Structures are given as C-alpha cells and as structure tokens.
C-alpha cells in the first residue's frame, strides 16, 4: 500500500514526510477495519480508499487559507483527517451527527496521535462554536445553498466556505443567497480518479 500511496502523492505533486505517509496508511487500515463492523463508507477496497478518500481530500490542501477549519458532515473524517495529518500546524474541528462516525474519529485521533483535531457530535445548526473559523469545509452537502444556509454561523467575517464537489453546476450559484459570492472554482486533479472534481470557494 505504501508504494501505491507514494506513487499517487508524486502524481499529485504533494510532498509530505515519511511519518505523514505512514499516518495516512494507518488511517486507511483503521477505516478498513472499522468499516467491516460499522459501515462507514461504501468504498470497501483499501487501495481504492487511497484514491477516493485520501488523495481526494489532500488535493484541497494548497487552497486552504488560515489556521482554523471545520469539516461539516465529516462522516469518517473526510476530508478533515487527511488534511489534519499533512497540516499539523492547522486546527481542525470535525463535526458529524452520527455517533459511530465520531467514535471512529476519536479512535483515529488516539491511534494516529493527532493533536490538532477536535471531534464534535452535533447537528450543524445546533453547534455554536466559541470561536469562528477561517474556513468551513464539506464534501457532504448536496448544494451550495444548503451549505451556506446550514453553516452561515460558522465562518469568521472574512472566512471562506470550501465545497468539494463532483461536476460543477452553474445553476447552483443562481440559488445562492445574494450575500455570498463565488471566489474561485478550481478543477481538481485526483490521480486515478475517474470523473470530475471541483473545489468551490465562496464567502
């Protein structure tokens, strides 16, 4: 698995330490183990997890501005855990409303010895953070409007929303509240992943 991950990282031009590579492999092994009992993801093959979960999360990293982020509807910690592993100086809150997902994340934090991740079991609309965030991340929302409607109280005044999407649908922008504007639409290149991936940055 290590050779495969090293190859994928090279193709994506992502440079990380050997320790971080090992943490990412350990994360996939943990996810695979827990998945058999708790059904955390529909992706069953660890090699496929490297592409669809790890690399798909990591390619967002160069575009993150700031130090404090929340991953809303994180599921089994995606993209939050991979991003936290390769950005140890940034802080990540991982929020989900399902207990088994947060239990997995707590276990992963312990096993991987991550000091920059805080798991939160809550519905997003009920979560009131003491401090707002530089960035609100999510792979979970069906539309940009849903994301901004549900998470409007989370970013700082100059913070950003980062929506990880498949195909970029321009009609989603027309549905947005007029107070939000699209800052960037970035076409992401994920090695060995079939299909389009986009990062939409708005505030």
UniProtKB/Swiss-Prot annotation:
Alphabetized InterPro entries for the sequence: rRNA_ssu_MeTfrase_G, SAM-dependent_MTases_sf
Location in or out of the cell: Cytoplasm
Keywords carried by this UniProt record: Cytoplasm, Methyltransferase, rRNA processing, S-adenosyl-L-methionine, Transferase
GO cellular component: a single term: cytosol
Molecular function GO terms recorded: rRNA (guanine-N7-)-methyltransferase activity
Chief location bin: cytoplasm
Reactions accelerated catalytically: guanosine(527) in 16S rRNA + S-adenosyl-L-methionine = N(7)-methylguanosine(527) in 16S rRNA + S-adenosyl-L-homocysteine
Stored SUPFAM superfamilies: S-adenosyl-L-methionine-dependent methyltransferases
E.C. numbers: 2.1.1.170
Residues given in the record as S-adenosyl-L-methionine binding sites: 73, 78, 124-125, 139
Transmembrane feature ranges: none
Domain of life where this protein originates: Bacteria
Keyword Aminoacyl-tRNA synthetase: no
Function field: Specifically methylates the N7 position of guanine in position 527 of 16S rRNA.
HAMAP family cross-referenced by the UniProt entry: 16SrRNA_methyltr_G
PANTHER family (UniProt xref): S-ADENOSYL-L-METHIONINE-DEPENDENT METHYLTRANSFERASES SUPERFAMILY PROTEIN
Stated family: Belongs to the methyltransferase superfamily. RNA methyltransferase RsmG family.
Protein name (record): Ribosomal RNA small subunit methyltransferase G
């Amino acid at each position: 698995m290590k050779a495969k991950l090293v190859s994928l990282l090279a193709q994506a031009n992502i440079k990380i330490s050997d320790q971080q590579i090992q943490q990412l492999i350990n994360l996939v092994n943990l996810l695979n183990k827990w998945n058999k009992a708790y059904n955390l993801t529909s992706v069953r093959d660890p090699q496929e997890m490297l592409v669809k979960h790890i690399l798909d999360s990591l390619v967002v990293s160069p575009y993150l501005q700031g130090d404090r982020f929340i991953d809303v509807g994180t599921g089994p910690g995606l993209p939050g855990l991979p991003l936290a592993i390769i950005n140890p100086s940034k802080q990540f809150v991982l929020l989900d409303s399902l207990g088994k997902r947060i239990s997995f994340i707590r276990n992963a934090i312990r096993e991987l010895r991550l000091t920059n991740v805080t798991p939160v079991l809550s519905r997003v609309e009920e979560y009131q953070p003491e401090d707002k965030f530089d960035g609100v991340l999510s792979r979970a929302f069906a539309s940009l409007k849903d994301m901004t409607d549900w998470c409007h109280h989370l970013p700082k005044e100059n913070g950003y929303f980062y929506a990880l999407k498949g195909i970029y649908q321009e009609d989603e922008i027309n549905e947005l509240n007029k107070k939000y504007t699209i800052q960037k639409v970035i076409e992401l290149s994920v090695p060995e992943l079939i299909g389009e991936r986009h990062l939409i940055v708005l505030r």
